Design a protein with these regions (language model features):
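Class I S-adenosyl-L-methionine-dependent methyltransferase catalytic core
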Residues: 1-156
C-alpha cells in the first residue's frame, strides 16, 4: 500500500495487523481520487475528514495532493497505531487524529470541504447518506461540500 500521487507519491503506508480492517486498495483509491479530481479540480486548501480512517490512506492521499488539513477518526486500536505511524513517517502537522466512534465525534474544529468514509463492510456504519446526516454526528460540512462513501458495488 502506498500514496498514489502528490507530494508523497510512492511513499509506503503500513496497514493494521490482523483482519479487523481491510485497507482500501491502491487501485480503488486511484479511481476514487481521479473521480474527485475531475469534480473538484484541485485538493489545494481543502479541509478533509477521513472517517473510519484505518491506516489513513484516504486522508493522507488528500494531504499529499494539497489538502490543508485532515481530521482522521478511528476507534480500532491496531488501526490507530498504523494511522499514527503513517502520519509520523510522513512528518505532517496537517493531520488531527481522534480516537473513538464516528457517531460520537463531536464538533469539528472547522467546516469541512470533503468528508470521506470507508467503513468496515457489513456493519451498517456507511448508512450516513448525506452531509446533513453527517452533521448529526458533529461534522460541520461547508455549504456545497461532498460526502464520499466507497462501496463494494462502486468498484466491482
Amino acid at each position: 500500500m502506498r500514496i498514489i500521487a502528490g507530494e508523497w507519491r510512492g511513499r509506503p503506508l503500513v496497514a493494521p495487523k490482523g483482519d479487523a480492517t481491510r485497507p482500501t486498495a491502491d487501485r480503488t483509491r486511484e479511481a476514487l481520487f481521479s473521480m474527485l479530481a475531475s469534480r473538484l479540480g484541485s485538493f489545494e486548501g481543502l479541509a478533509v475528514a477521513d472517517l473510519f480512517a484505518g491506516s489513513g490512506a484516504l486522508g493522507l492521499e488528500a494531504l499529499s495532493r494539497g489538502a490543508a488539513s485532515c481530521l482522521f477518526v478511528e476507534q480500532d486500536r491496531a488501526a490507530l497505531d498504523a494511522l499514527r505511524a503513517n502520519i509520523a513517517a510522513l512528518r505532517t502537522s496537517a493531520a488531527e487524529v481522534r480516537a473513538g466512534s464516528v457517531m460520537a465525534l463531536g464538533p469539528t474544529p472547522q467546516p469541512l470541504d470533503l468528508i470521506m468514509m470507508d467503513p468496515p463492510y457489513g456493519t451498517g456504519a456507511g448508512a450516513v447518506p448525506s452531509t446533513s446526516s453527517a452533521g448529526s454526528a458533529g461534522l460541520v460540512p461547508q455549504p456545497g461540500s461532498r460526502l464520499r462513501l466507497p462501496s463494494r458495488r462502486m468498484w466491482s
